[in-house]
Amino acid sequence: MSLIRKSTELNIPTNVKMMIYGQAGKSTVALSAPKPLLLDFDNGVKRMNMAHLENIDTVQVTSWNDVQLVLQEDLSVYQTIVVDTIGKMMDFIITYKCGTRQPSIRDWGGINAEFSWMTRTLSSLKKHIIFVAHRDTRKEGDDTVFIPALREKSYNSIVTELDLLGYLEMKSERGVQRRTITFDPTSRNDGKNTCNLPSVMEVPTILDKNGNPTTKNDFISTRIIAPYLTMLQSKKAEQEAYNKVLSDITGCLELVADAASANDFIAHIDDFNHVGSSKMKASMMLAAKAKELGLIFNKETKTYSDAA
């Protein structure tokens, strides 16, 4: 069987892997994803409004062993894993590998391998993954670009795997503070937007002036993941229709036993409810069946005849 697949034959993952970096509010936004488990490397829970932690399960990481143990537990009740922050996670890996001393050049191979193990293990869970990062800067000529605070090699290795990279910031417009996130790369921030989200999205204020919640914290669930899953569902429906027509074609090809039945198949090939490349696939399947039967194809009449 060929390993080459048409677009309608692909297995499309339904999980989103993203990173959020920037100014205040990153953790709260990350926890707006569906059924999150928070891996708190940064001791950030102490800085969060407790209303945002209601019904949120948290692992307060004290050593890298904590991470290794929790990833062996049954995490089936969670839909999202939040890593807060990925930079601090790297610090735990360095401590795990080097203790209290500074890492040497020889240490970085093991450190990078452990970092890769972590990202692979998270991906294998088949859940939404959200990395939270602090903000750093990078000079590009005269421009200063905001980037996630993460060692360059680690950043370069993980950004290729992300579906989304979002920069969160506060903006003041006519005296009103607005929190926005952009996933588009710009001259002032890194970004990645494979889900075709709007260029700039406003993150709603969910607390009143007294710190009491005014609405549900569900920005990522409703504004990012839900539209993405709707798009995937549309693709899945197309794929199911494609699989259905291929099943019908396969059933009809089982009846092809000679040139007459092969030519009858050709005459009715347009009767199938074709999706995408299914008509081309049907022609290829017929050609394979005809070869198996030893039929001869006439290129001029585009019909088959039985072998002499």
Task: Give short role names for the model-derived ranges.
Residues 2, 7-76:
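Conserved P-loop
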Residues 2-14, 50-62, 66-67, 174-235:
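P-loop/Walker A phosphate-binding loop and immediately adjacent motor/lid segment at beta-alpha junctions
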Residues 4, 11, 21-22, 128-204:
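Phosphate-binding/switch region of NTP-binding enzymes
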Residues 5-8, 24-26, 33, 211-308:
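Interfaces that engage single-stranded nucleic acids at replication/repair/recombination sites
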Residues 27-30, 121, 157-158:
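Hydrophobic/aromatic ligand-binding patch that stacks against planar heteroaromatic rings
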Residues 32-34, 125, 161:
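Short, structured coil segments at secondary-structure junctions
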Residues 76-80, 88:
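Long, charged N-terminal accessory/stalk domains
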Residues 85-156:
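P-loop NTPase motor core
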